[in-house]
Amino acid sequence: MIDAAQVDHLARLARLELTPEERQSMQADLNSILGYFEQLRAVDTDGVEEMQRPEDLVNVLRDDVPGEVFPPEVVAALAPEMQGGFVRVPRTVEAE
């Protein structure tokens, strides 16, 4: 399991300054996490088929078919401002 020296090493790598209480807490937390991995490692998985996820997900796609197109007059009536037959919108990207 993880000892205090390893916790200190990890703290230095992560540039953390731990108090003695935080060091003890971190050591206990890391040992708990590693203990959980040991439990997982002990599970017999022989004969279990590998999978990426527990459910078979399938994308439901629709055909890309053009729908109703609004006449230019309707678009112009809905737009706040038109310029040269196009809808004018506020600038969203500033030039560098």
Swiss-Prot record:
SUPFAM superfamilies: Glu-tRNAGln amidotransferase C subunit (SSF141000). It catalyses: L-glutamyl-tRNA(Gln) + L-glutamine + ATP + H2O = L-glutaminyl-tRNA(Gln) + L-glutamate + ADP + phosphate + H(+); L-aspartyl-tRNA(Asn) + L-glutamine + ATP + H2O = L-asparaginyl-tRNA(Asn) + L-glutamate + ADP + phosphate + 2 H(+). One of its GO terms (biological process) is translation. GO terms for molecular function: asparaginyl-tRNA synthase (glutamine-hydrolyzing) activity; ATP binding; glutaminyl-tRNA synthase (glutamine-hydrolyzing) activity. Belongs to the GatC family. It comes from Deinococcus geothermalis (strain DSM 11300 / CIP 105573 / AG-3a). It comes from the Bacteria. Allows the formation of correctly charged Asn-tRNA(Asn) or Gln-tRNA(Gln) through the transamidation of misacylated Asp-tRNA(Asn) or Glu-tRNA(Gln) in organisms which lack either or both of asparaginyl-tRNA or glutaminyl-tRNA synthetases. The reaction takes place in the presence of glutamine and ATP through an activated phospho-Asp-tRNA(Asn) or phospho-Glu-tRNA(Gln). HAMAP family: GatC. Heterotrimer of A, B and C subunits. Its EC number is 6.3.5.-. PANTHER family: GLUTAMYL-TRNA(GLN) AMIDOTRANSFERASE SUBUNIT C, MITOCHONDRIAL. InterPro entries: Asp/Glu-ADT_sf_sub_c, GatC. Pfam families: GatC. This is Aspartyl/glutamyl-tRNA(Asn/Gln) amidotransferase subunit C. Keywords: ATP-binding, Ligase, Nucleotide-binding, Protein biosynthesis.
